Amino acid sequence: MASRIAKDVTELIGNTPLVYLNNVAEGCVGRVAAKLEMMEPCSSVKDRIGFSMISDAEKKGLIKPGESVLIEPTSGNTGVGLAFTAAAKGYKLIITMPASMSTERRIILLAFGVELVLTDPAKGMKGAIAKAEEILAKTPNGYMLQQFENPANPKIHYETTGPEIWKGTGGKIDGFVSGIGTGGTITGAGKYLKEQNANVKLYGVEPVESAILSGGKPGPHKIQGIGAGFIPSVLNVDLIDEVVQVSSDESIDMARQLALKEGLLVGISSGAAAAAAIKLAQRPENAGKLFVAIFPSFGERYLSTVLFDATRKEAEAMTFEA
């Protein structure tokens, strides 16, 4: 009997399950399934690209464990994806991150031994990128992975996420719904799905408050991980059939409903993807169609955010019963 023990934690990445949404999708004429990326080793879809970008740079001879210092600007989850891979492979990692991101993300990054530099939240991801470039310029053997520009980002989704969805749905997928942060997921997985069936539609999700892809202006919003305020070079906008806008409030409410009605504790961007997919599945022309939405991350990473404000206050105010 062959051993099924993984060589290290990076071998556990991928092959996440798909599950139908039932109660929150009541009244829909189409069906909605979620790809549960919270089941990754470090609980987010970014585990895939963290591993992919480091491995790709290693194969190209651009970095070496124990010598190279990896640097990356991130809103949090990519940092975690890079952090556990860097720890397993023996790299020092410096992360720049807007100070508005959740406390959990800071703690997790520090737990993995990351050197964390917080940046002005008013400057968003652009501020984090500028700080990372400044650090890179003065760091010997520094190497920036650049998730917004690195082809290894969409490549891993083309090689793994897309095929997993195609196989998991038995090729019966009609629409793929993905929030757009770097654009790597929708570009890579979407390209693969369209190659299998040109009729598969790709739906990008962005915040109403920062609807860049729809021709709007960048603005502050509460959906951590999507709506970066610019169009990343990794994103192939030509692949996208439609951009669906959802508000921060809609996304937060849906994330809460997913916990209460589906037993799925997810982050705010999962709420955004679900809200968008349900809107699509409610359209009469989509009767009988199957939409797969990416749920990027686990809700436990958002306990200190607006998502769990009321719950946290209730929990903190509780006293024991005699």
Swiss-Prot record:
Instruction: Give cofactor(s), names only.
Output: pyridoxal 5'-phosphate
Q: Kindly give the CDD domains that the UniProt entry links to this protein.
A: CBS_like (cd01561)
Q: Which EC number applies?
A: 2.5.1.47
Quote the protein name from its UniProt record.
Answer: Cysteine synthase 1
* GO CC annotations, alphabetized: apoplast; chloroplast; chloroplast stroma; cytosol; nucleus; peroxisome; plant-type vacuole; plasma membrane
The protein's annotated pathway: Amino-acid biosynthesis; L-cysteine biosynthesis; L-cysteine from L-serine: step 2/2
Q: Does the keyword Amino-acid biosynthesis apply?
A: yes
What top-tier enzyme class does this entry carry?
Answer: transferase
Using the UniProt annotation, give all residue ranges assigned to the region (SAT1 binding): 217-222
Q: Which UniProt keywords apply?
A: Acetylation, Amino-acid biosynthesis, Cysteine biosynthesis, Cytoplasm, Phosphoprotein, Pyridoxal phosphate, Transferase
